Each structure stands twice: as C-alpha cells, then as structure tokens.
Amino acid sequence: MTFDINDKTAIITYEGSDTIGRPFLDEIIFNYKSFSSLNIIIDLTPMKSVLFKHIHDFTELASRHKEQSDKSFVIVSGPIALRLLPDGLNVVPTLHEALDTIEIEEIERDLGF
C-alpha cells in the first residue's frame, strides 16, 4: 500500500501485492496515528474484484475516525451494490469524487451541520 499524505488528507492506496482483508486493515490501523488528524481516503480502485466484505471491514474505523477527529473518511471503489453498505459509510467510484466529498463535508462542518 502507498500513503500519500498532505496537509489535509491522507490517501491510502491498495497495491496489487497487498493482502486484502484484515492484514490490509491492520496495517492502516498500525499507521493510523500518523494521519489520524486528517481526512482519510482509502483507494481500492487498483483491486480487481472488490467484495462487500472488503468495504464493510472499514465500518468501525470510519465511524471512530469521524467521531474522534471530526474529519472525513471516504472509500474509493469500483462497482459495488451501494444499497448493501452500512449507513454513514462514504463509498464513491473515483478519487475525484472522494476529494469532492471531503470538500463538501468540510463546508458542512464549517457551517455547523
């Protein structure tokens, strides 16, 4: 996996050699303190086949991140049945949309929504 961290956002990208599932999530959690104060994007687009369970694995981390840091957590994924995803989990099809989602959520936080 690669970590691309700037002043507002950490983009964590899956690479083909990564083991998806718990090992992937565990590595993110292990490094979490280094980007816990930032918006987080998990980019799974390089993954050939994204399953519901791969997305669902991030539910707890996403919820905790939003509550504790008051920052955004967005997952970028290829085709997946959005109706099956837990409420409150942001999943979008492109990195551009992930960045747009973060921008909108930052505006909402600034306005007190």
Task: Indicate residue ranges for each PLM-predicted region.
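Amphipathic, Lys/Arg-enriched alpha-helical "gate/interface" segment within cytosolic domains
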Residues: T2-F113
